[in-house]
Structures are given as C-alpha cells and as structure tokens.
C-alpha cells in the first residue's frame, strides 16, 4: 500500500447503479475511489498510483481481465479483485486472471465487498 492516508481504489463497473453503490460504500469505509464506467475508461487512468483494482469482468470496451493484466504489468503487486455475474464463464473461456487476484460472484452484499477489500488492502 502507498504512504497516503486513504488507500486508492480504481473501480471499473458498467452497471451505473452498482458502480454508485460500490463507490459510496467504499468511500464511507475510508477509501478514495475513482469510478469508471467501462474498461477503456479504467485503462486510461492506470498510470496513476492505485492500491487496489476492483473490476467487473464483462464490460464494454476492454474487459476486466484485460484491464487487470494491464494494471498488473504497470503495477506489480497491485491487489486485484473481480466482481462479476459471469465469473465461471469469463474465466473458463481461456482467460486467466493475474496471480493473486480474487473473484467475487454477483449478487453480493456491499458489506461483503467492503470486508474483502479491507482484507486485501491489509494483506
């Protein structure tokens, strides 16, 4: 984790409502969140300093796995978490997530996501 007081999370989620709920829940938990509507938007800010990438897998433009690969290449050791309703399908289709990443399946409670983010940031 960086030396900043608030860990920074890059959130990529194409569902507007879910993206808003996640961003607010994580901000209330003490995180600085940059929320992106798709993989292309997230890829455009990958050069910034992030503590965790929280991304959907199936999105318009770049999918979450490709965003995660690019993020991991630029930031070795970056914590990566996928939230998706298509985890089994997306990851079984020959796609491989970066080592050490975590996959959470939708539907999922916001509390559970915040708890998992807390655990990954603390690790």
Outline where the language-model segments fall.
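Conserved acidic carboxylate
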Residues: 13
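Acidic catalytic/metal-coordinating carboxylates
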Residues: 38, 63-67
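Acidic, metal-coordinating helix/loop segments flanking the phosphotransfer/catalytic sites
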Residues: 35-52
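Non-catalytic signal-transmission and effector/linker regions of two-component phosphorelay proteins
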Residues: 1-10, 77, 111-123
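Receiver (REC) domain active-site loop signature in two-component systems and cognate sites
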Residues: 59-60
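Charged docking surfaces used in two-component/phosphorelay signaling
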Residues: 17-28
